[in-house]
Amino acid sequence: MKLKTKTMEWTGNSLRLLDQRKLPFIEEYVECKTHEEVAHAIKEMIVRGAPAIGVTAAFGYVLGFREYRSGDLKEWMKQVKEVLSRTRPTAVNLFWALNRMEKVFLENLKNENLGEILEEEAMKMAQEDIETNRAIGRNGAELIEDGSTILTHCNAGALATVDYGTALGVIRAAVEAGKRVRVFADETRPYLQGARLTAWELMKDGIEVYVITDNMAGWLMKRGMIDAVVVGADRIALNGDTANKIGTYSLAVLAKRNNVPFYVAAPISTIDPTIKSGDEIPIEERRAEEVTHCGGNRIAPEGVKVLNPAFDVTENSLITAIITEKGVIKPPFEENIKKILGV
């Protein structure tokens, strides 16, 4: 079984990941042959984006199973899952994917074809992600008017998923439907996913895109230059509170103040029904060097103290709607999320 998209390639024996740290200047793949190499790729942001992380971890689980040599298989796979789980604490898709793989593993523990069954499940997950993103795109495109200028933050495109994207999937689907769309991509400090990745993706697709600094958004909204904000999500609480790349909350506040619709585009798997509100979402703190350095060059004084939370939480009152593959969820969010989840 094989899979090949922009973000990842499953060769049948290894997982090749597009090294997103080097984009847009170098297109280079990193080959992972063990679950620990996959964990390293997730932790070091060779691959990033909640849906992509989830599927990557699923293939890491497959590789972990193949590494088993002797002893208690269940205990070995528990350790494999733990190694992969420790990589990124905020993205719920990671845990969703690993729990799904573990369930299949335990249900087929005595099956002699267990390795093939696990590989099939990871492949199924990858294909589902592509189909899900296209459904999100179709549902979201209906909210985009012809001639709109859309502001997006970070990168929630094909690079953040198996293919097509969530927030950028909405934009792609609108363009495919014949609508004229212009995009403003926040540079998204400190990792510059907007400037490096979103701009790269949209330019390859021939979609008009402007890179703006993170602190321009409010002024552009005030001048009436932005018609909607569309972002992705790393975890959504049961009440609709949404964790996404740091800076998302600021955009939501600005959008509310300037009467600009603020949309979150994410698969149902990003909703965490075990978390009642955003107050319970763990926020990853990353290395100081990501803030003090840019492009390998120091840009801040030696020894300066740094805060580097990778995500923030936008409360549901600032969100116009959540776009999913099962439809568009509008307020009251908790009631409507429960309906769509069937809980």
Swiss-Prot record:
Source superkingdom: Bacteria
Gene name of this polypeptide: mtnA
Similarity remark: Belongs to the eIF-2B alpha/beta/delta subunits family. MtnA subfamily.
Residues where substrate binds: R48, G49, A50, R88, Q193, N244, K245
GO biological process terms, semicolon-separated: L-methionine salvage from methylthioadenosine
Any Pfam family the entry gives: IF-2B
Active site: D234 (proton donor)
Protein name: Methylthioribose-1-phosphate isomerase
